[in-house]
């Protein structure tokens, strides 16, 4: 299996139900969306059970790749806050069978 290292940049907070139709089928009945972030095309959804990454591809945006990372499969993480001259903060997570996934949040994002 090839090692994956996806990187989602330019994330900013959105309403919890923003784009719900795009990922609702991946949310379980006893699962709650806690945080929602969106870049120009991609999304990061944080639930009480997993991280859900949506990578929108292609010119029309019809092609989407969904990556689900259950918390039970995470093996490590790293956080870097935005500094005086930095425009973003970073969160890196490592999971079983995945090298790392990196998220870059715009400065001022909660």
Regions found by a protein language model. Give the residues of each.
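Anionic N-terminal interaction surfaces
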Residues: 1-45, 108
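Low-complexity intrinsically disordered segments
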Residues: 3, 92-110
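Phosphoinositide-binding peripheral membrane targeting modules
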Residues: 26-43, 47-100
């Amino acid at each position: 299996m090839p090692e994956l290292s996806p990187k989602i940049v330019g994330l900013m907070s959105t309403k919890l139900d923003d784009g719900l139709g795009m990922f609702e089928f991946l949310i379980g009945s006893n699962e709650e969306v806690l945080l929602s972030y969106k870049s120009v095309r991609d999304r990061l959804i944080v639930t009480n059970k997993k991280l859900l990454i949506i990578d929108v591809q292609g010119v029309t945006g019809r092609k989407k790749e969904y990556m689900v990372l259950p918390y039970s499969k995470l093996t490590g993480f790293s956080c870097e806050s935005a500094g005086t001259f930095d425009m973003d903060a970073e969160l890196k997570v490592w999971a079983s069978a995945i090298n790392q996934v990196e998220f870059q949040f715009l400065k001022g994002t909660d």
